[in-house]
Amino acid sequence: MKKVTIRDFIKKKSTKEKITMLTAYDYPTAKIISNTGLDSILVGDSLGMVVLGYANTLNVTMRDMISHTRAVARANPPQLIVADMPFLSYEIDTKSAVKNAGLLVKAGSDAIKLEGGEEMKDTVKAIVKAGIPVMGHIGLTPQRFLRLGGFRTIGKTKQEEDQLIKDSLELEDAGVFSLVIENTYVDIAKRITEKLNIPTICIGAGPYCDGQVLVINDLLGLSEFTPYFAKSYVNLKEIISNAINQYIIDVKNNKFPEKQHYKERES
């Protein structure tokens, strides 16, 4: 599989070939993904919740994102690597936003993703001007869950719906190459997808986007809580627990290690 590029992303919209994206946070996972036909890896700030054990993503730092981006990049996957910009790494001013975006690219990402709507237009323009591709993110934006009143579906009111449409158009105009739409109503996501020339990637926003993204822990059945919009394709939590329990039994009953697991001196 050849390296997936920004151009490939945009082409898939015109050919109506669905884009597939999953999160990954470490070398082993990225190495497995590299041997699949997945289009893109998102080094998401969701690592704060599913890897580091935080209650939300607000505690994730640039140091965290750089470290995990490097780990994923070391697997040298052909997938397009997109790294999240963490909370307060891009909101303060455009200068620090460009600098932090550059640090993620130096760590191995092919593009960065940031949350927010029209208020992020100047920031997006500055990062794109610096030569760094930007993926937008609207709808439920986890870094802003306090302002949004919690993790909820966005677009219930006409005002929210109109704002989502406006945000998507403003971000496209600012130069984002793609747009994540999270946890909004399916008809709104469909309208946005039809209005934009750039590909949309849905998570909890229905089937009419140009692609889908999931947190890999949800897909693999590893999460403590799986949101309604995610699908578990395997229950790795159960498989891993069974393996650990079998190991305990084998050790306690002297069934491990067996002869093939150690060496004896020749007599």
Curated annotation (Swiss-Prot):
- Name the EC number(s): 2.1.2.11
Q: One short Pfam family name for this protein?
A: Pantoate_transf
The cofactor remark states:
Binds 1 Mg(2+) ion per subunit.
Q: Which GO terms describe its cellular component?
A: cytoplasm
Q: Which residues form the active site?
A: E182 (proton acceptor)
Q: Where does 3-methyl-2-oxobutanoate bind?
A: D45, S46, D84, K113
Q: Where in or outside the cell? A: Cytoplasm
| Coiled-coil intervals | none
Instruction: Mention one GO biological process in which this protein takes part, according to its record.
Output: coenzyme A biosynthetic process
The Gene Ontology terms for molecular function here are: 3-methyl-2-oxobutanoate hydroxymethyltransferase activity; magnesium ion binding
* Keywords assigned: Coenzyme A biosynthesis, Cytoplasm, Magnesium, Metal-binding, Transferase
Chief place where the protein resides? cytoplasm
Query: Which reaction equation describes what this protein catalyses?
Result: 3-methyl-2-oxobutanoate + (6R)-5,10-methylene-5,6,7,8-tetrahydrofolate + H2O = 2-dehydropantoate + (6S)-5,6,7,8-tetrahydrofolate
Q: How does it assemble?
A: Homodecamer; pentamer of dimers.
What does the UniProt record say this protein does?
Catalyzes the reversible reaction in which hydroxymethyl group from 5,10-methylenetetrahydrofolate is transferred onto alpha-ketoisovalerate to form ketopantoate.
Know the name of this protein? 3-methyl-2-oxobutanoate hydroxymethyltransferase
- Native source species: Saccharolobus islandicus (strain Y.G.57.14 / Yellowstone #1)
